[in-house]
Amino acid sequence: MDRIAEAFVWPVRDPDWLTKILIIGLINVIPIVGAINGLGWMLASMDRLRSGEEKLAPANFSYLGRGARVFVVYLIYGLALVALGLLPYIPAIAIAVSQNHTNGNAGLIGLALLLNLVAFAIFTLGSLLLTFMLPALILATDRGGIAAGLRVGDVLRRSTANPMNTLIAGLMLIAASFVSSLGVIACFVGVFFTAAYALAMQAWIIRSFEIGSAAPKAG
């Protein structure tokens, strides 16, 4: 429980946390560039955690290069998931469109529904899988570059080496995503703040995963 709580509260230990969060939040508004810089800032904040300094990285535009690698890798994984989901979805739509309301074939309509369910399952389960793989994926990319992040086997091996560690990290990332969305729920008033705060949380979560995956198993 302490591990979970720390992810939420560690950013405020930095005396300048509010200013840094707001600046990164404003930078995040810039399409694509903001997201890339935010990822790099998250990694730089994680570096500070590695050094034992519980302070957020300075808020500026200096993290584009580092964040770009993670952005590219995650984009490739996302596009692969979309392509996989479209394999059953496109035939489902084609079959459904080919059936008119008066002379539709019940078997074909049933097949279209089944294919739609398969596509939905692929998108849903694939998104969850990506979430739970994210800590290992980010660490691999940050250390070894884009090629390392795309070594699916290595990423999966690290993710499954300590299932409980991966489960906790994945659930915490889902919680961080919820925090990020709170600004949208509040009519976009706090979206700048909550999105950047979620990035700070992710730095702690991924660092915590890194420590857990490096620790030797008992027994």
Regions found by a protein language model. Name each.
Residues G78-Y89, M172-V189:
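Alpha-helical transmembrane segments and their membrane-interface junctions
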Residues P11-L18, G67-G78, R158-G170, I174, ...:
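Loop-to-transmembrane-helix entry motif
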Residues N28-R50, G107-G149, S177-K217:
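Selective recognition of hydrophobic, aromatic-rich stretches within alpha-helical transmembrane segments
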Residues A59, R66, F120, M133, ...:
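Short, well-structured alpha-helical interface segments that form or flank functional binding sites
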Residues A7-W10, I24-R50, S62-L128:
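Short, small/hydrophobic-residue-rich motifs at membrane-helix boundaries and re-entrant hairpins
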Residues D2-P15, E53-A68, L150-T160:
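A short amphipathic helical element positioned immediately N-terminal to and/or at the very start
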Residues T141-L167:
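A generic hydrophobic-segment detector
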